[in-house]
């Protein structure tokens, strides 16, 4: 892209300065994403220069550019006549495309373009989208958006350089494919219907209710409609589905990425594994529990468009690698789990959470977003001061108003008791007694890292097989211990 722009700015003005020159300037770079949208990269691969110290080979570059041009011409001719007319009519006055369109003797129309789009993309876009506005204001972006919509693989993504030069592409795809119309159409009634997609992705017929309240369904619908929200769900109340379903829907409709920010690394792995067990491989996590090879593969999956859900910890937002891979993707929503960590009134306050708004603002500026990226916040804490702190934070940093979804239902399946003991030895004996009585998966919380290993070892020696889990363990050991607990190989895990 850079070389192409340098050529047009510096070399072309000398080559074409003579009025007697009748050469046509064709830039294959701009044509490739239109004709090869399944590939998120330019098809001109310089495989003779895989080592960065090697010298450029301009002759070979020219040969490859010629081969690419011939491929593009062949692909253009394979398009239906109506699709050729559509692309040509959208791009006819644009310098980036005029050379190629002249070379292929493209035909144009001046009227009836919206009707042609509706005919060619029936069932793929909302039939009530404002096509006249898009054609008038964003013809190039619309052409690239339609090319992406044509792809059969939802993991295909628009190349980063296209998004940089035509940032409106993401806005257009969202308008055409992920904005529910008020009038109602076949596309919106199926692809944007949450009950239809709940059955498609998870096999459920209906959403969970809380003492008759359809909280899960209402919060999911709000997310699909692009609203920012704060949901107060009881622990184990199905909050994951509330953001996973909209994320999967957006992955299919706009090739989008939902970023889930959580301080709980073990929970990230658990959710990714649970989705994989359902045959949903769209989720990826990048955190400190990963070894370098697995981390590299996860990053590659995000870059290649294979991920619709990315789980990261808040401190990862300071990583330049994370920023780079997110800039190249269409981020449709930020989900913040354990949102009470924003509030300085709680014991779980985390300074890294205060960077989230700054990161989102910087991301929106770099991507030249036309609309704010919505956020979903989840917490099980319903204290009014904490709720106000969360709402105030997003209003002040991103000018977002959060719709509140709070359940009045209480957790009837939880029982608490406080047991008095005189000494540490009495405490251990009572714990061992409780473990023996229960004979079920048990999590024992301790206050110090060293105690996780000490207590797990002591329980194991007494015949109650247990494993430790804390932040200072090696990633491989943490993953192995978590898997052993989740797969019922051990019933007790000692957690910091």
Model-derived segments and their meaning:
Residues 2-7:
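Short, small-residue-biased leader/transition segments that mark boundaries at the very start
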Residues 9-16, 496:
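Short, polar loop motifs at secondary-structure junctions
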Residues 13-23, 389:
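Substrate-recognition/cap helix-loop segment adjacent to the acidic, metal-dependent catalytic center
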Residues 20, 25-50, 340-347, 480-481:
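Short alpha-helix plus adjacent loop in nuclease-associated cores
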Residues 46-128:
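Acidic, Mg2+-coordinating catalytic module of metal-dependent nucleases/exonucleases
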Residues 136-190:
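Interdomain "pre-motor" coupling segment immediately N-terminal to P-loop NTPase/helicase cores
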Residues 186-192, 196, 200-202, 214, ...:
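Helicase motor core with emphasis on the C-terminal RecA-like subdomain
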């Amino acid at each position: 892209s850079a070389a192409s722009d340098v050529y047009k700015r510096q070399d072309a003005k000398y080559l074409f300065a003579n009025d007697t020159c009748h050469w046509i300037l064709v830039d294959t770079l701009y044509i490739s994403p239109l004709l090869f949208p399944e590939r998120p990269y330019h098809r001109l691969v310089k495989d003779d220069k895989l080592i960065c110290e090697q010298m450029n080979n301009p002759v070979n570059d020219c040969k490859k550019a010629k081969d690419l041009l011939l491929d593009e011409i062949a692909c253009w001719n394979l398009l239906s006549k109506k699709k050729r007319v559509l692309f040509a009519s959208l791009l006819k006055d644009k310098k980036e495309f005029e050379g190629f369109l002249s070379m292929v003797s493209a035909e144009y129309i001046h009227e009836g373009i919206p009707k042609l789009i509706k005919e060619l993309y029936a069932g793929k876009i909302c039939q009530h989208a404002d096509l006249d506005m898009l054609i008038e204001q964003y013809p190039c972006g619309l052409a690239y958006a339609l090319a992406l919509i044509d792809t059969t693989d939802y993991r295909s993504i628009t190349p980063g350089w296209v998004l940089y030069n035509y940032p409106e592409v993401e806005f257009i795809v969202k308008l055409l494919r992920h904005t529910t119309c008020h009038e109602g159409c076949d596309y919106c009634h199926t692809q944007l219907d949450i009950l239809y997609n709940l059955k498609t992705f998870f096999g459920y017929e209906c959403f969970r209710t809380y003492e008759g309240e359809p909280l899960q369904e209402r919060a999911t619908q709000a997310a699909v409609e692009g609203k920012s929200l704060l949901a107060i769900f009881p622990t184990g109340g199905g909050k994951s589905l509330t953001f996973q379903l909209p994320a999967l829907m957006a992955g299919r409709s706009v090739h989008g990425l939902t970023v889930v920010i959580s301080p709980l690394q073990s929970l990230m792995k658990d959710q990714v594994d649970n989705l994989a067990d359902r045959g949903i491989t769209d989720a990826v996590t990048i955190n400190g529990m990963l070894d370098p090879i697995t981390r590299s593969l996860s990053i590659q999956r995000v870059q290649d468009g294979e991920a619709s859900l990315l789980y990261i910890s808040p401190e990862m937002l300071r990583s330049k690698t994370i920023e780079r891979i997110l800039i190249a993707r269409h981020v449709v929503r930020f989900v913040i789990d354990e949102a009470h960590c924003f509030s300085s009134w709680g014991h779980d306050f985390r300074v890294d959470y205060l960077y989230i708004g700054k990161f989102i603002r910087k991301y929106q500026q770099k991507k030249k977003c036309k609309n704010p990226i919505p956020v979903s916040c989840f917490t099980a804490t319903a204290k009014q001061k904490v709720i106000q702190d969360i709402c105030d934070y997003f209003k002040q940093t991103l000018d977002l108003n959060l719709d509140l979804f709070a359940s009045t239902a209480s957790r009837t399946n939880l029982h608490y008791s406080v047991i008095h003991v005189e000494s540490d030895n009495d405490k251990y004996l009572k714990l061992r007694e409780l473990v023996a009585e229960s004979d079920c998966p048990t999590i024992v919380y301790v206050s110090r890292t060293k105690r996780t290993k000490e207590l797990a070892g002591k329980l194991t020696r007494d015949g109650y097989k247990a494993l430790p889990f804390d932040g200072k363990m090696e990633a491989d050991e943490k993953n192995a211990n978590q898997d052993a607990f989740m797969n019922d190989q051990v019933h007790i895990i000692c957690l910091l």
